[in-house]
Amino acid sequence: MHIKHLNKKLIAAAVVCALLATATQARAPGKNLAAAIDTVAASAVTSGESPGLQVAVFKDGKAVLVKSYGSANLEQHVPVSNESVFRVGSVTKQFTAVALLLLAEEGKLSLQDKLSKYYANFPRADDITLEQMLHHTSGIYNYTSEPNFVNDGMVHRTTDEMVEFIGKLPKTQDFEPGTDWSYSNSAYFILGGVVEKVAGEPLATVFKTRLFVPIGMTHTALDDETELVPGRVRGYSGAAPGKFTNAPFISMSIPGGAGSIRSTAADLAKWNAALFGGKVLKATSLAAMLTPGRLNDGQTAGVAIAKMMSAAGAPGANSKQEYGYALFVSQEDGHRKVSHGGGIYGFSAALSEFPKDRVTVAVLSNAIGKDVGASKIADRIERVAIGLPPKK
């Protein structure tokens, strides 16, 4: 009788121990994953790839790591905190795309509208659709490629003044609309202007009231260089790892809907959770956003992207990348990746979603230049986050 009770107690104890061991094992990968990501991020700053860094990694909707590293201001020796605010460059474009899609859902515009409906005097406006502009297949020349852009970028302009400026450049078109793919900041700046015309409000207000506030992005705004912003980070140009200089000035009226947002890594992770969680757009709109753009001949934009990258000798030229609305869709060793980077004077950013892995990675850097900045650091963090070994 006592032996039976003892056996039952031993069995129960063994079961409890097994459950505790299982629970410990279940928690361990999260802790180990956070430590592994932390090591990658910390070493990037130590090796001089960025003066400062902000990282947010989420898995299954929960934070694995939200942490900041290094310096927000090299001259003042101010450390980066999780509330420090970085410019995110072209990550802005997906917000512009979503604003257009929301207006389309409300029947206030169509993505098949010709640009001439909103900017009648812009060159070739009768031949270009809003959707082609979203896909970078409009052929509109990229104004940031202008040789004098550094000087042009110092001048504050209204949206209409900027659209007029783009339309009067010596070159306005790279190719016939719909026949090729070429990244165009001009197209997305103009799309920001379309949002303003249709919504009847400044782009900053549209973003704030329809996107940032509802999602709880408390440290995010369309940037204004004259505004005093708590936690604003100083940006740097990098000639090489560890060799930084203060970045050139740019009026944030110049990037507009193509690249003017400031944010934090944690806020961008919130954005991805809301966007891919179906809380921002209708399912059909989100699906359209992720659908590869097509050229007039029926080929996807990815064919043209591959040719362009190959001709430029760019890394990853042999990997298939497609482009939807302000999002690249690709594969990372069999893992579907939806992403966009950003680069603007002094800053670089990378925001990625791995839908099947349920992993979000946001990396913000206050550096841009050769072998510095967010891109390569984010690549390494992403591979750790989705369980892949480092690239050789």
Give the location of each predicted region.
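Bacterial N-terminal signal peptides that target proteins for export
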Residues: H2-A12
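Secretory-pathway/luminal and periplasmic proteins that interact with or process carbohydrate-rich
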Residues: V64-V66, F122-T129, G139-E146, P214-D224, ...
